[in-house]
Amino acid sequence: MKKLKTKPNSSIVHPIMIALVITFMFMNISFANAVTQSKVNKFFENLNTLEADFIQVSSSGNVSNGKIYFDLPGKLRIDYSEPNNLLITCKGFWIVIQDRNIKTTNNIPLNQSPFSILIEKQISLSNKNVKTEFENKSGIISLTVKSSNNEQAGQLILEFSEKPFNLKKWIIKDNFGDITTVLIQNAKYNKQLSHLLFFPDEFPEPIN
């Protein structure tokens, strides 16, 4: 007796194949995300200090440059070159902004600045007080960091090159909607920094 050949039911096979393909894709994505998170976690676990040159581009297109220093946790210095000649320092609960051309000083609470996410404590992707999102495109890894309990802190987007794995720039979005992009160059990691870097300048008292 001749055996009949039967065709597989396409209405069953196609959904199964699609499900397998989707499952495989998500397994790859999950694995890639896990590897990426591991690299980022390792970067921050090993990060104690940073010294680098920077180029800053504001929402309006203004370009500034200077030197930046981090000593984690809690210390920050952004030293702008002329003609801006601004100095931003932090070594506690306040960010001090100084205009050295006109000798003025303004203070803002650290917790109202996007920098609070980065310098109050070293970033941990398992920190419940911080929301994180990953994106990996064309060898550039983006990590978006937001405070879970403080909308005033805005958000910070950190961009890393994949090979070699290094911090390349960050983008600050404040609670007013302004966007500032900072490109990092000539970065030196974990170099010993003088604690004096993080003190504001002392301006002479105005003469009446």
Where are these regions (language model features)?
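An acidic-aromatic
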Residues: 67-117, 180
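Gly/Pro-enriched, hydrophobic low-complexity segments
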Residues: 127-132, 136-207
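Solvent-exposed strand-loop boundary residues in beta-sheet-rich modules
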Residues: 58-60, 101-103, 176
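A short, Trp-centered hydrophobic/proline-enriched beta-strand micro-motif
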Residues: 42-61, 69
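Bacterial N-terminal signal peptides
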Residues: 15-28
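Short hydrophobic/aromatic-rich beta-strand segments that constitute the beta-sheet cores
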Residues: 54, 76-80, 95-98, 143, ...
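Boundary at the C-terminal end of the N-terminal hydrophobic targeting segment
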Residues: 32-34
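N-terminal secretory signal peptides that target proteins for export/translocation
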Residues: 1-13
